[in-house]
A protein has these predicted regions:
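Alpha-helical scaffold segments that mediate packing/assembly in large oligomeric complexes
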Residues: 91-169, 174-191, 308-310
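A conserved acidic, glycine/proline-rich C-terminal tail/linker
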Residues: 258-272
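Short, hydrophobic/proline-enriched secondary-structure or compact coil segments at domain edges
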Residues: 13-23, 27, 32, 44, ...
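Assembly/oligomerization interface modules of large self-assembling protein complexes
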Residues: 22-86
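Protruding loop/beta-arch "assembly-hinge" segments enriched in small, turn-prone residues
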Residues: 1-36, 269-310
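Short, well-structured alpha-helical interface segments that form or flank functional binding sites
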Residues: 102, 106, 200, 279
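Intrinsically disordered, low-complexity linear regions
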Residues: 2-26, 49, 134-135, 141, ...
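Extended oligomerization regions of viral-like shell subunits
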Residues: 165-259
């Protein structure tokens, strides 16, 4: 029986770190990957875009000095936030559990999944906010992916050409991806048929657009208020954005659309509550300290109403 006020548990921490729902559904880690920071309050750099594209005079005279250039960065500050949940496991349940069932592990998995889902929603909110993009476009009636007469391939290619760093990833909500992959012109371009039937694969569309990846958000959450009938809603619905992602970027070097600063690792710990139930309960706590950030708006091009019904 655990009697310490708060005792880290290595076994439960391993579950919290390793536990994943279907990784096809959870995409937050792909768009906003984790980077470690040494303090809860941290600094990160934003780099002036023009410095990477301004061409200085590199010619050097026979006895002259080469021209000097300087590289600057705008240092910004941010703070991680704590996210966590508790799950009580009554001693009564532990003592009566079947041999092949561990209520402590089950509680850890359950709250870990909810924490992941909450992170998914936070990241989807960032991706949906048009203020996080230097480039944005509202697709009017007739140009949306749901309109068979539109030309989504041209729309996406021309948008990518407008981005200073280009794009290597297309981020889509499931409804936008369905509209895109069923669009007659996309089907025709990928299958070489008339386009009146079939569906395009992500690999085929990525090849058409010369992108490294197409990431589709499939996760869902209950959007109803507590106590009301469940309303299961896609987390990434209507999201459509071209992104430049760089997994090697961190808060000091490299440019990427966004990342998640994390202080420390995911943790799981326990404490004993003697006042819970007749025999007390072991309370499982899982959490992390992190902050999701969009750090380079120039690395994104967002489309609004891409899958709206005309």
């Amino acid at each position: 029986m655990v009697k310490q006020v708060f005792e880290p548990d290595t076994e439960l921490t391993a579950i919290a770190i390793g536990y994943k729902n279907d990784k096809v559904n959870y995409i937050a880690d792909k768009i906003f990957p984790y980077i470690p920071v040494g303090e809860p309050n941290f600094r990160y750099n934003e780099y002036p875009v023009e410095e990477g594209f301004s061409v200085p005079d590199t010619k050097v005279g026979r006895i002259s000095k080469p021209n000097v250039v300087e590289f600057s960065a705008v240092s910004k500050t941010a703070s991680v936030e704590d996210y966590g949940l508790d799950a009580p496991v009554p001693n009564y349940d532990v003592t009566r559990a079947p041999k092949n069932y561990d209520p402590r592990a089950r509680a850890t998995e359950g709250i870990t999944d909810l924490i992941l889902l909450d992170r998914e929603l936070r990241c989807a909110k960032l991706a949906r906010d048009l203020n996080n993009y230097a480039h944005k476009e509202t697709l009017a009636e007739g140009s949306r992916f749901t309109d068979e007469a539109s030309d989504p391939l041209r729309i996406l290619l021309e948008a990518r050409d407008k981005m200073i760093l280009g794009a290597n990833t297309l981020l889509l909500g499931m409804n936008v991806w369905t509209a895109l992959r069923l669009h007659p012109k996309i089907v025709k371009a990928t299958h070489g048929n008339s386009g009146d039937s079939g569906a395009a694969s992500r690999e085929a569309v990525a090849e058409l657009l010369e992108l490294s990846d197409i990431i589709v958000g499939k996760s869902r959450h209950d959007s109803a208020k507590k106590g009301q009938k469940a309303v299961i809603t896609p987390c990434w619905e209507d999201v459509c954005a071209l992104l430049y992602l760089n997994n090697n970027a961190d808060n000091n070097n490299g440019i990427t659309f966004g990342y998640t600063a994390r202080f420390g690792n995911k943790v799981a710990a326990t404490y004993f509550d003697k006042d819970m139930g007749l025999r007390g309960a072991e309370v499982i706590r899982v959490g992390e300290s992190c902050k999701e950030l969009v750090v380079a708006k120039e690395c994104g091009y967002a489309f609004e109403d891409a899958a709206a019904k005309d």
